């Protein structure tokens, strides 16, 4: 698993990882909401994703927060390895940019939370999420998560079918607002800390 320093350092960069699957056929799937949030954060920073060498990920480097001590250096990342292999690219980026595990934020879909509800936390289990499972295997569980609720599949629909389908038409009416809110939550976590972000965004 390698050296996985979990101690947050005020001067260390932050790595915000949007989890998803690469390719246009997955772009609007429920499972790709992490990519949607990462894309919005990229727009805010004002950069374009570029290939990260051998890390099998797309990245943008930038800064967020007001001038002064609260200004943070961030790396936005979208693993290009498919969801269940996300840990390898994320850990490679962590090592390359010297990011403490505690300075990593994974933005991902969450089945056990109602649609659009956010829950922020540090550490914990993977709750059956293959992207988190891969990350935890690569570097341990002590990273932050922005969990974006997608709810459970209706009736007898299989979970795999549900997460790999696009959001329903009724859900899409709110999706832009909810993705914007999740991006705000990730920024707040990095700039002001987990407790403040939880108090503001945990629904």
From Swiss-Prot:
Residues annotated as site: Stabilizes the basic form of H active site to accept a proton: 109
Site (described: Discriminates between blocked and unblocked aminoacyl-tRNA): 21
Keyword field: Cytoplasm, Hydrolase, RNA-binding, tRNA-binding
Binding-site residues for tRNA, renumbered to this chain: 26, 82, 84, 130
Cell compartment(s), UniProt: Cytoplasm
GO cellular component term of the entry, any: cytoplasm
Xref: InterPro entries: Pept_tRNA_hydro (IPR001328), Pept_tRNA_hydro_CS (IPR018171), Pept_tRNA_hydro_sf (IPR036416)
Catalytic activity entry: an N-acyl-L-alpha-aminoacyl-tRNA + H2O = an N-acyl-L-amino acid + a tRNA + H(+)
Listed EC numbers: 3.1.1.29
Subunit and partners: Monomer.
PANTHER family xref list: PEPTIDYL-TRNA HYDROLASE (PTHR17224:SF1)
Protein known as: Peptidyl-tRNA hydrolase
Gene source species: Streptomyces avermitilis (strain ATCC 31267 / DSM 46492 / JCM 5070 / NBRC 14893 / NCIMB 12804 / NRRL 8165 / MA-4680)
Name of the gene encoding the protein in the UniProt record: pth
């Amino acid at each position: 698993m390698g050296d996985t320093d979990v101690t947050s350092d005020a001067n260390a960069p932050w790595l915000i990882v949007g989890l998803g699957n690469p390719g246009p056929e997955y772009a609007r799937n429920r499972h790709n909401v992490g990519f949607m949030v990462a894309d919005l954060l990229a727009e805010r920073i004002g950069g374009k994703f570029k290939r990260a060498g051998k890390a099998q990920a797309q990245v943008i480097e930038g800064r967020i927060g007001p001038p002064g001590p609260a200004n943070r250096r961030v790396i936005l990342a979208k693993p290009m390895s498919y969801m269940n292999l996300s840990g390898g690219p994320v850990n490679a980026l962590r090592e390359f940019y010297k990011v403490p595990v505690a300075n990593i934020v994974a933005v991902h879909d969450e089945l056990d939370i109602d649609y659009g509800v956010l829950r922020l936390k540090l550490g914990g289990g993977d709750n059956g999420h293959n992207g988190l499972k891969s990350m935890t295997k690569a570097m341990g569980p002590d990273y932050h998560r922005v969990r974006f609720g997608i709810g459970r599949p209706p009736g007898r629909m299989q979970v795999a079918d549900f997460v790999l389908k696009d959001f329903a038409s009724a859900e899409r009416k709110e999706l832009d607002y909810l993705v914007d809110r999740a991006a705000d939550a990730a920024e707040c976590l990095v700039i002001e800390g987990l407790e403040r972000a939880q108090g503001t965004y945990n629904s």
